[in-house]
Amino acid sequence: MCRKCILNKDWEKIKSHILSVHSQVRKLVGLPAKPPKAEGSNIHLKCNYCINECVLSKDDISYCGLRNISKKEIGELPFPSRSKGYIHGYIDANPTNCCNAWFCPAGTSRGYPNYSDYNEPEFGTYSYAAFFYGCSFSCLFCQNWSHKNFSKRNLFDVDRLANQIVKNKKITCLCYFGGTPEPQLPFSINLANKILEKIKKLESKRKFRVCWEWNGSGNRDLIDKCMKIALNSGGNIKFDLKSFHEKLNLALCGVSNKRTLENFKYLAENYFGTRGDDMPEMSACTLMVPGYTNHEEVEQIAKFVSEINKKIPYSLLIFHGDYQMRDLPITPRDQALKSLKIAQKYLDNVNLGNKFLLGFT
């Protein structure tokens, strides 16, 4: 179904088809078609970590797949918590391919000397990449869809992980991504705080930054805590603004982007610029999906961001076919350059990421 039909045709008919497609795709990996909403005496668990706000009966599975009461009761899949999280972690040499590396302390000289010991990119150091399993969205074009496949062996203890990270003094930052961190925000907050507390006790001069990359659908109180950690440590937060129109977000990602836009606006209005002009606290990012996230969509997103603050960094990413959209081509060069030019009309700091993929077009 094309972009024009999604935005302009009979929405009730379009929506029915969209939900059917997502239902079939999610069934392939054992996930519910929509967020469960148990009622009355059937309620066994309520979760408010993200926009989906699942209400589970004993037979339900949360939309993210991380909370399965039946499997929890037999010990097959314990619930994630503040002290345990489903995560795949590894060290990544700085500067990394992180979406914000073009302006962060690890990839530039920004942040020196308050948040980095290097007056240049931090070569010879590492970022701890914390890949979270589970997601509050269900993107048909997901570039990291392995997050849907996890088991008990992927459950890590927060203290053990914090000690491992602190022990390696070459690790200068922690980046949460996934999936998306929202379904496990309490764990991410606890881990970040423990690392920073341990470093402060052991060696007060060590610089250590914490960053989040997410779809922005999280609980307001929790994302506020994340922002404060990122702000104080010299890290930042990247929002995936996958689309501007809610209908398009529902079509591509299965979930509304209403809370994403609200959360972006809230954090930007309250925190962006508080560290000064040289250290952006947050950014926006958009994957240019051919035929869907075109220059018109990019213009709406760029305009939305600019109305909050023109200095907020915005990154446009080249798409390559993956997951259920493997048949789509790489973002055409003309589309990428046109979108870049349009975004630059609205914003002062625009970046084109994954440029190497243009060599395959």
Predicted regions and their residues:
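Auxiliary Fe-S-binding modules of radical SAM enzymes
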Residues: M1-H17, R26, P32-N42, C47-K58, ...
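Flexible, acidic/Gly-rich N-terminal and inter-domain linker regions that tether
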Residues: M1-T125
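Generic domain-boundary/flexible-linker signal
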Residues: K13, K58-I61, G75, F141, ...
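A general structural-boundary detector
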Residues: K37, D117, E122, Y126, ...
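Structured core elements
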Residues: K46-Y49, A129, C175, K238
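Conserved Radical SAM active-site core
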Residues: L66-N232
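Conserved AdoMet/S-adenosylmethionine-binding subsite of the radical SAM
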Residues: L155-I330
